[in-house]
Each structure stands twice: as structure tokens, then as C-alpha cells.
């Protein structure tokens, strides 16, 4: 488990390129037949990926020991979105078929979660966010047909994009975790511009669906002290509450956003005008 400490905005603005990457970038999300796990002290979110190929991958008691509990989800809830081939997730003996861009919410208290791919030639790639939970909500599969896509932006400003809200109050109940998937239209490059912060929750972006020769310049930092981190395919970045989170790519891309904190209202944002950025 890779543990990342909280960091003050006044400290973050003093960091060089490598310092910013060390604090905020999750460089390797998927490893064959393993799970990756980054634990952030910011709202205690856990971020990672699971890519089973030749065997199943379990997340259970061995992780619980690192969290001071008996098993991984004893006091946590889990959200998973599959960006790869078809797979299965078995939760305490109940098997769910999770296809490409299907998602599964797993409620607090599940003792064993087992991940598998159906075809080793096209393995599943399960990206997940995990957050502390105070009560148990039912485990539920969510498919792309069950979300309500919202298209925002304009081709003229190169930010036309479709937002798919998977884990939000209108779709299912969670304790605090919200997740969704945003896809840029072909030829569009910007996400979340004009940008915002949100004082009441943090966020993690996971960029994917990118060519090897493409990248995203992820904008971060306090609005008057902006910095950037260069992101490549299937990498994630941690965004504290005080930081903007926006990006511009060399080509169109897709990203998964995950938020935890004290408010699940999607539009609870502190907007920042483009003219006010520095």
C-alpha cells in the first residue's frame, strides 16, 4: 500500500515537477494479476486498479490488517468501474458479471471481494475508489444504460463532453462516495474549464482511452498558484479540496472522477473564472 499524506496548498506551490508527481500522481494503476492501492490521508480515500489475467485477484483480510480492521470493507464502501474486457466480481459468494464500462458498488461489510476476467486475451481492468462508510447500503451493479448522460460544453471552446454519473444519489445511495465517467467528443481537448474547487470534498481523476503518443496536461493548485502534471494513459491524480482540477489533452480522452467528503450534491462547487486564474 502506497500511503500519501495530506499537503497544504502553501507547501504544494513550492514543489518542483518531481515533487508534485510524488505527492499527487498515481503513475501505475494496473499490474497483471495484482491489485494496486494508494491510500491518501485526504478524506481517507483509497484508489487503485485490479487486472486479473491468469488468475483471480482477491481483496480481503490481508488488506484489512493494513487498515487496522479485520477485512478491507469492514468500515468502507467500494466503487468499481471496468474499463477493460468482460469480467466478474464475486462479493461474499454472489457473482456479478461486469462488462466494459459496467460498474459495481459494494457496500460496507462485504468480507471477500474476488475479481476475474472472462477472456485472458482481453482482460478486465477494474478501476476502483474506496472510502470510509458509516452504514451499509446494498451492493448494486450499474450499467451505462442506467446512468443519465449529460452533454456540456461546445466545439468552439474545445470542451464538448458527456458526463455519465454512475454513483450519485439519483442512481443509488452511498455513504459519501460519488463516481462517474466523462468522455470528450472527438476533436475536443479541455475538461472542466472554466474550472472550480470544492471546499467540502476532494476528488481523484483517472485518465484513460489515450494513445501512447498522447498526454493530458492536468491543471492543479490554488487558482492563483496554478501548476500542472503531465498525465499519460491509465494514470490517476489526487486533487485536494483547495485545488482546481482541469486538463487539456493533445487528443480527446476519457476520465473517471471520484469524490469523497461531506457533501454529495454534484453542483456544490466553488467556481473560478478563467480571468481569475494565474
Curated annotation (Swiss-Prot):
The keyword Metal-binding applies. It catalyses: 5-dehydro-4-deoxy-D-glucuronate = 3-deoxy-D-glycero-2,5-hexodiulosonate. Its cofactor is Zn(2+). The keyword Metal-binding applies. Pathway: Glycan metabolism; pectin degradation; 2-dehydro-3-deoxy-D-gluconate from pectin: step 4/5. GO terms for biological process: D-galacturonate catabolic process; D-glucuronate catabolic process; pectin catabolic process. Keywords: Isomerase, Metal-binding, Zinc. Zn(2+) binds at residues 196, 198, 203, 245. Transmembrane segments: none annotated. GO terms for molecular function: 4-deoxy-L-threo-5-hexosulose-uronate ketol-isomerase activity; zinc ion binding. Its EC number is 5.3.1.17. Belongs to the KduI family. Catalyzes the isomerization of 5-dehydro-4-deoxy-D-glucuronate to 3-deoxy-D-glycero-2,5-hexodiulosonate. This is 4-deoxy-L-threo-5-hexosulose-uronate ketol-isomerase. It comes from Shigella flexneri.
